[in-house]
Amino acid sequence: MTSRSLLVLTLCLFFLAIAMALYVWQVRSRAQFEATMQKPQVVTPPSTGTPRQVTLWVAHDDPGVLRVQAVSIELSGERQRKTQEILRALLAIYTGKDSPHHLAPGADVRNVYFVNPGLVVVDVNAALADGQTSGILPEELMVTSFVQTLSSNSPEISRVKFLVDGKERETLAGHVDFSSEFEVSQMADLARQLSSE
């Protein structure tokens, strides 16, 4: 083997090593990016409101009941943001480690809209709907929990409509009709039945 062919072989191996290093770096970067994308976390801006006592209706799947829980959270003065903060406090319970009604960690309320007198539209993300336990009772508990929490803290609400990622969805997780409005008075009757069991 001549020195010229040895030099060419060495250069080829050198460039091959550089190309492999770049490839490994690219694969590693892509894997890190995908890992961060698979773990959605709810990021809430620091609250500048005043601490207030709110009433949460918490679903408990195991006994199949609703329980009222009072918590103190910082609330904004703006109605939509205040309502969203209350629902996020409820979701913090559901996404917690020892949750009585488990939801996926990425579950969130995207927005809340007060459309006309008495009607509020709650836009949740797909992680909340997709992470919901399928079954009539768990789904009824979830919807009733949201509606009762809203009406307990904002008595002017008489109807609640849900959207998932800004769109109507036929069912929550296969059973409870999620496409229509929920009347607070009817849900209050259901809540009384579910909280007395």
Model regions and ranges:
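Bimodal "functional hotspot" detector
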Residues: 1-197
